[in-house]
Amino acid sequence: MEAEPSQPPNGSWPLGQNGSDVETSMATSLTFSSYYQHSSPVAAMFIAAYVLIFLLCMVGNTLVCFIVLKNRHMRTVTNMFILNLAVSDLLVGIFCMPTTLVDNLITGWPFDNATCKMSGLVQGMSVSASVFTLVAIAVERFRCIVHPFREKLTLRKALFTIAVIWALALLIMCPSAVTLTVTREEHHFMLDARNRSYPLYSCWEAWPEKGMRKVYTAVLFAHIYLVPLALIVVMYVRIARKLCQAPGPARDTEEAVAEGGRTSRRRARVVHMLVMVALFFTLSWLPLWVLLLLIDYGELSELQLHLLSVYAFPLAHWLAFFHSSANPIIYGYFNENFRRGFQAAFRAQLCWPPWAAHKQAYSERPNRLLRRRVVVDVQPSDSGLPSESGPSSGVPGPGRLPLRNGRVAHQDGPGEGPGCNHMPLTIPAWNI
């Protein structure tokens, strides 16, 4: 692109001003910025950091999608939500990370108006869908642990919920897509390494009034961060209380006491994981939202705005995007079924026959399951509704309780008939 003159032709000088006065006025009103916002070492550091989380996001979320779609036994309600979370995080990696990195490295917007609108819309929708899916996972865990005998979600209802999530994400980001536009910054130019000047273009929300942008920022903050965070914290606190209040095995044998100690340690690990999930979401997105609110509501000087846009925003965006890269680890690796599904899928592809991998991954040996379960105390229910969260939705027989992942827990202890006051419900520790 050819450089435009930094001064207009002589015929455009306003009447009543001589040439020297105009030259002085133009020299003081024009702003020149470097084409690259950072030095080479700083830019290399940002590029390496963004490439790292991009690769983690692509590999981790692709593996989650592969495991769920490859194994029919993994297509449970919660895993459908985790699959949707992986899809939305993949969109974050594809559409958010590269454009944000480019926008943070160079001055101005290098793409056209259509890319400006579509990039903003897809970015906002993918982030919103990711956050809304985290809430859906928390609600589903809450229903299965705190209220295990209430009617469970079916796969059809889960898919409908996912469709609603994306519809809400589209609805909340429509104002941004409408107002986003590419505008040329008057009296502001970019300079390359050879001192050639280029016009500066920006992709930003052109609201009719500045106050409307402030209101929209507050709405986004409430719907994409504050309310989801409150719901996630409330749900996980209730789950943690339920786990902590659950009694151990009723038998007083030495083996039962030892199993009770192991159960307590497993409960503690589950509670720690729930705390980690809530804290990680809070800390990942809080810096970016603080900066966005400062831009709209803080009375910042030009120097402060420049420092925030050049240094603070790239770090805040990186931290928020890291959340999408770490979700497969939090919701996938810490889930026993995902670990076994991953092993089964790759053993079947690499060297094992499919039937052997399937048998190894989904073995229902009682001693293995017993070591990985958490006992939760629940009240008996007269409804006897089976769990429809998994592939097995048949009505459980006497002495058996439905689990959220479609398995059945056998109750073979004494005094566990219909007249028993409390029934222990076993739940896989990392599947909540």
Curated annotation (Swiss-Prot):
One of its GO terms (molecular function) is G protein-coupled receptor activity. Disulfide bonds join 116-203. Receptor for NPAF (A-18-F-amide) and NPFF (F-8-F-amide) neuropeptides, also known as morphine-modulating peptides. Can also be activated by a variety of naturally occurring or synthetic FMRF-amide like ligands. This receptor mediates its action by association with G proteins that activate a phosphatidylinositol-calcium second messenger system. Expressed at high levels in the hypothalamus. Moderate levels found in the midbrain, thalamus, medulla oblongata, testis, eye, whole brain, cerebral cortex, striatum, hippocampus, cerebellum, optic nerve, placenta, spinal cord, pituitary gland and ovary. Belongs to the G-protein coupled receptor 1 family. Its main location: membrane. GO terms for biological process: cellular response to hormone stimulus; G protein-coupled receptor signaling pathway; neuropeptide signaling pathway. It comes from Rattus norvegicus (Rat). The keyword Isomerase does not apply. Residues 65-80, 139-158, 236-273, 331-432 are cytoplasmic. It is found in: Cell membrane. Keywords: Cell membrane, Disulfide bond, G-protein coupled receptor, Glycoprotein, Membrane, Receptor, Transducer, Transmembrane, Transmembrane helix. It holds the Pfam family 7tm_1. This is Neuropeptide FF receptor 1. Residues 380-422 are annotated as: Disordered. The chain crosses the membrane at residues 44-64, 81-101, 118-138, 159-179, 215-235, 274-294, 310-330. It is a multi-pass membrane protein. GO terms for cellular component: cilium; plasma membrane. Residues 380-406 have a biased composition (Low complexity).
